[in-house]
Amino acid sequence: EAIVAACNRGEIDAQVVLLICDKPQAEVVRRAERLGVECFAFSAKDYATKEEYERQIVHLLDSNGVELICLAGYMRIVGSVLLEAYGGRIINIHPSLLPAFAGARAVEKAVEYGVKVFGITIHWVDDTLDGGKIIAQRAFEYDGNDPEEVHRIGQQIEHKMYVETIKKILK
């Protein structure tokens, strides 16, 4: 939503043309539809292979003239079909200061470990798990043990940070 709003305000010289979501019932699908963004919501189990649904995604990206893919909450490892077609044009936002706490449940793992400095990382997507070249990072301190509070603070930072980073990439 923050990216669409920034595009609509002219803050980012781009247009969000497509939302791809691997959870058809996710609230983001309804939000995107309200904002007039085309949606492709799929369930991986409806496809025989990862390559099959990634080919469908590539077709949709190509037919919509997509130049940059911005992942958010996409909890799947990007596969070879998508990387071959769009490598170097896919970014991801992750709720930790990578390379620490890569993968799923990053915030929960960090809280369990006793971390006091949390953060957000935006990175290029490659064939590793959250291992692509880092584009931007922002840290924040939190001295509690509530993962939900860390997520809440992090999401406030993410919205502004992703917009700023996309602007820089597109310049």
Model-inferred region functions:
Residues E1-A5, R55-D62, K160-V163, K167:
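Amphipathic, non-transmembrane alpha-helical secondary structure
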Residues E1-E27:
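N-terminal Rossmann-like dinucleotide-binding module
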Residues A6, D22, L68, A72-K171:
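Donor/substrate-binding cores of folate-linked one-carbon enzymes
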Residues Q15-L18, E38, E67-L68, R89:
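Proline-centered loop/turn at the N-terminus of a beta-strand
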Residues E27, Q56-I57, I77-V78:
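Short acidic active-site motifs
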Residues E33-A41:
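Short, conserved SAM-binding/catalytic segment
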Residues F40-K45, I93:
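Short beta->alpha connector loops at strand-helix junctions that form conserved
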Residues A41, A48-V66:
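Glycine/small-residue-rich loop that forms an oxyanion/phosphate-binding "nest" at active or ligand-binding sites
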